[in-house]
Amino acid sequence: MRGFLFLLSILLRQGQIVQNILNNLIQPSLKKRIIGIDVARALAVIGMIIVNFKIVIGENGLNWVKSFAGIFDGKAAATFVVLAGVGLALMTNSAIKNNDKSKLKIVRNRILKRALFLFIIGISYTTIWPADILHFYGIYMLIVILFLTSKERTIIISAISLIIIFPILLSFWNYEIGWNFETLEYQDFWTINGFIRNLFFNGFHPVIPWTSFMLFGYWFGKQDLKNNKFIKKTFWVCTIIFILIQILSYFSISILSEGNQESAKELTEILGTNPMPPLPIYMFNGISIAFAIITACIIIAKHFENNIIIKALNKTGQLALTFYVAHVIIGMGIIEAINPSKMGEYSVIFSMIYALGFSLICILFAVIWKKHKESGPLEWIMRKLTD
């Protein structure tokens, strides 16, 4: 009997050693970043740079260039927020699947700290960049914390509810209150009522309904993103939905306006895909294009993992926070320092060339920086303060 127990203990120890070896072999692949996510994040940041430079530096000139730049309006930012939701899911998936409450508590606290960090960073330069998304971002994250362990159905219903609630709010409150749309200034931003109104209802990226982008991203991140069938199906479904919404929007405005320019302008606010106000047609348009871009990036990055462009965009996406802040402080700051009185008066071609040039510098910086450092400058500070 003793001999049997001794033999059993040896076998158990051997089994444990084998298990540890297997875990060490398997874990790295499980923890490996999905390259396509970072590539999509890089493209989203570049899209936001194009949109924001166009607004701030100037968009005078050729209509076709303005139309091209206008493609990114609201869509790059929506993709950026959806990707944040995906990131939150990837942070929490392991703890939730293993029902590891202590690990989940640590991750929840980390998300809470990062939300506060982003809120403070965003608010700190709102005076020079009123269209900041980071302080909104922080509030979205605080709300998503409430849904970390919720069922997927609850997450989707909550996200759709936020989209539906917004037009209901419009029937009670004036969307234009506080705004000077000629200068894009929010007149009572620094009052309690004005700040809360801007944050939740009629700011550039209001909590209602923009939090739904992050909730949809969180739902998406909980899926099996290494399942090729799911990724390809999502790509085609969302691409078709996006195209159908664009067609529906265009023909609805054309038919109902009957060629009247004033009517077309008014109808565009309701049936168009512009981000302000963020009505359901824009929200679903933003969600569909975000999923289409993310899944396309996952598919392409998987097939061309060693491609120099994919590698560069992968590294750029990992420094997305740094580049978002840099495009305001450095990118816009340089142009304003050269000629403050001309801000907003430059041609759209100049704004586009400058945006693409700045984006290229960001990519080169990311490639060089990642050779020496694991995290971007601002990402490193955030992790030091929140991990």
Name every feature range the model reports, one short phrase each:
Residues 2-387:
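Alpha-helical transmembrane segments and their immediate juxtamembrane cytosolic regions
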